[in-house]
Amino acid sequence: MLSRTVFVPLILAFVGVSISAPVSNNNGTDNDESAADQRHIFTVQFNVGTPAPADGDSVTTDGKDSAEKNEAPGDSSDTTEKPGTTDGKDSAEQHGVTTDGKDEAEQHGVTTDGQDSAEKRGEADGAPDKPDTQNGTDDTDSDQETDASHHKTGDSDENKDKPSAEDHTDGNHAGKDSTDSKESPDTTDKPEGPDSDSAPDGDSASAEKTDSDHSPDEDANKSSTEADKDDTSDKDSSQTDEKHDSDASDKDEKHEDKDEKSDEKDSSKDSEDKSQEKSDKSDDGSNSEADEQKESVESKDHDSDSQDSDSAEKKEKHDDKDQDSSDSADSKDSDEDKDKDHSEQKDSEDHEHKEKHTKDKEEHKDSDEGKDDEDKSKSDEHDKDESESKEASKSDESEQEEKKDDKSDSDNSSRDSHSDSDSDSHSDSDSDSHSDSHSDSDSDSHSDSDSDSDSDSDSDSDSDSDSNSRDKDEKKDKSSESRDEDSSDSDSKSNSESSETAEEDTNDDKDSSVEKDKTDSSDSASVEANDSDDEHDDDSKDATPSSEDHTAEKTDEDSHDVSDDDDDIDAHDDEAGVEHGTDEASKPHQEPDHHDDTTHGSDDGRKTSMPIS
């Protein structure tokens, strides 16, 4: 893009200069004016955006009109007059034909050689702040234009005798040469700026720069050393007529040989130097001081730029091979710096964006982890609650089962105790009654005291019958209550089995009791049975209120503990033991469970068996 923006206005400027060259440079004396034109064009080409006018006179620095220069192209005195000159010298004097002009030219060239070289370099280079790629092409263009003008300058004496038409044809021919030589640097694009950077001092640097910049092809580069030699020899010698003759011969034979072309360019350079010196003299009369100061400042700036470019090229040769000057290197460095800064900014922005993205991801991950942890904690709590509720329900169920087992065990134990107490009390009462009756009968038979034996037997039988009746009533009540509880607890199977075993046990007890009764004497047994039956009826009446109280208490306390049953059983057993005088409560109870009331069966058995016996 940079090359496009540079070359498009350059091409337009070249076209404008090539059109205006034969018109404004007919006399060949406004060399400084053409250089100023091109310098002004390239300093304001980006601001104005339009090429210079066709005549090229609107941007002149001397303030003269173009009509004043182009009034009479055939008049040699008008064409050779420099703008701002007050001495009115003719062209021959200005070109050094007279000794005075020659001495002035030599003196001016010797005394102000460095200044003129610096001025010429400043004018040819144009604005020093532009890249040297532009300056190189500008120098070639300006030098080509000045070459064409100085071909006519060398023939200024001949132009006095020639008509204006011939001069115009010569100008057109020179314009064609300038366009031809102008197109060659555009196609080759040879870097020519660095030659001036390696110059050791001001004079040789200026001479080499002018030679290298004004030579568009290889032949001109070969003849640069010859040009230096010719410049020094021309300054030392006063043979100006030979130079003009060589200019004329070069103009006539400029397409014949390459050597002649190089000589022609060398002579044109010499005439350019002289015309430059003369223009400097004429400008000293009016405003040459300001121009010289500006040009000296520009030359100093250009020298400093050249020194800077040397160091820059040494540091950045591998990066700046295609660049022609330090200014272009600086511009490329600035572009590279901008690119680096832009890339660094992009990298920093990308890095910040990545950091933000990673932070957002981390925060999102943390939030997700927090949510997952919360969900996990909630699920764990929920599982714990469920497990606790399950455990609680299981514990409740186990407690209920244990309670049921305890109740069944308590019922079984109570039934066992009842059956044991029944069997024990029954057997004891039987044994006691039989033993007492037997002993009493024996004692009666021996002592013949029937009354005593009867009283003893009656007392013993009364006590035995009372205890038996109480135990029977209590057992009836407990057995009835235990039946109700067992039916509510849905333990029918175990109860039925236990009832079967209990019936078997009671049957065994019945058999044993019947056998025992049979072994006793029939008299004592019959008397005891009658007495016990009579007393049983009386005791049953007395025991009914106590049994009713028992049932009322147990219906009110359905959820009684096993310990209460055990206490009741122990209390009843203790009472029975106290009455009998034996430790029936301390006897082991290991018989199986039963639900049926065995007292009635046993009583019935006794009642039925006794009369039979």
Curated annotation (Swiss-Prot):
Composition-biased stretches, type Basic and acidic residues, lie in 62-72, 117-132, 147-193, 206-284, 291-449, 467-482, 509-521, 538-554, 574-607
Q: Does the keyword Signal apply?
A: yes
Where would one find the signal peptide in this protein? 1-20
Q: Where in the cell is it found?
A: Secreted
As one GO molecular function, the record gives: calcium ion binding
Q: Which UniProt keywords apply?
A: Secreted, Signal
Q: Which domain of life is it from?
A: Eukaryota
Instruction: Recite the other comments.
Output: Otoliths are structures composed of proteins and calcium carbonate that are found in the fish inner ear in contact with the otic epithelium. They are essential for the perception of gravity and acceleration.
Its biological function? Essential for the formation of otoliths in the inner ear of developing larvae and for the perception of gravity and acceleration. May be one of the organic components of the ortholiths.
- The protein here is known as Protein starmaker
Species of origin reads Danio rerio
Upper lineage: Eukaryota, Metazoa, Chordata, Craniata, Vertebrata
